[in-house]
Amino acid sequence: MWTMGYNEGGADSFNGGRKLRPLIPRLTSCPTAAVNTNSDHRFNMAVVTMTAEQNKRELMMLNSEPQHPPVMVSSRWNPTPDQLRVLEELYRQGTRTPSADHIQQITAQLRRYGKIEGKNVFYWFQNHKARERQKRRRQMETGHEETVLSTASLVSNHGFDKKDPPGYKVEQVKNWICSVGCDTQPEKPSRDYHLEEPANIRVEHNARCGGDERRSFLGINTTWQMMQLPPSFYSSSHHHHQRNLILNSPTVSSNMSNSNNAVSASKDTVTVSPVFLRTREATNTETCHRNGDDNKDQEQHEDCSNGELDHQEQTLELFPLRKEGFCSDGEKDKNISGIHCFYEFLPLKN
């Protein structure tokens, strides 16, 4: 900044007698000031140089020395082998929960072997008791499981021996073949562990075969005997057994079919006419009365034996019954069974 000043001499009219001068006064240059400036500069340079050298030395020291991680100081107790040996010996002697004074004594004794505090001794006894309880419980559970497994194995082996004994491992084939009049279909093989079942089946099977055989034989015998009897016995026999024949109609039908089958199987054809029966009525009256009782018993036995077999099919009566040639005049209204009727069919004449 410059200011205008007044020139008293007035020599310069162009400037109007005025001139510019600075607001801040100029510093006068002196040799002492230059010396001071040079000395400060030298001091600063020396400080910078020393600092740089110190930094270099520190870097060199860091590079030359190995780097170690910082050591972390832990507050956890690390027992020494001697301390553990003393504590385990005290535990074996019976010390489980020591008192405060006893803990202080143990701590003072163990400080000779390393760093330790009273709380470390207390927690060591507590943890040792807990570990011993867990170990005992684990042993008990393992022993119980072994006992259960052994018991289960014994039970399973015993049950297997009872289920499949060596004496009963016999595979029996029930292949019984019956005689005349029985089914010849063999039974399926089956494994039997009981000896009573095949005997019962065999008895039932033989009973059925015997019943069929007896029925066929009785049917043939009865048919032949009834063919030789007079007509008067037919009506009396029918009157005596009318109720049984009505009540047991399926049995009568089955007997009819059995007797007819037996007669056809024997291939004997017998033809009896009504005239022949009338002529024999007078001569065989006493024989009829004498044989009547035997025939009644035989027919009753036949009805009883045939009544037990209900599996036979019923047969239909294909032809009506004839009563004129077989009954007397007083007994024409009575029904006559179809087992005593025989027909002879002759060829028709053209």
Curated annotation (Swiss-Prot):
Primary subcellular site in the record, as a coarse category: nucleus
Statement: the UniProt record of this protein carries the keyword Transcription regulation: yes
GO cellular component: nucleus
Keyword entries, A-Z: Developmental protein, DNA-binding, Homeobox, Nucleus, Transcription, Transcription regulation
Any one of the GO BP annotations: plant organ development
Pfam families in the record: Homeodomain
InterPro entries assigned to the protein according to its UniProt record, in alphabetical order: HD, Homeodomain-like_sf, WUSCHEL-like
Database matches in SUPFAM superfamilies: Homeodomain-like
Region of interest called Disordered, as start-end residue ranges on this chain: 283-308
PROSITE patterns attached to this UniProt entry: HOMEOBOX_2
Subcellular location: Nucleus
Homology family: Belongs to the WUS homeobox family.
Function: Transcription factor which may be involved in developmental processes.
Protein name: WUSCHEL-related homeobox 1
Source organism phylogeny: Eukaryota, Viridiplantae, Streptophyta, Embryophyta, Tracheophyta
Gene: WOX1
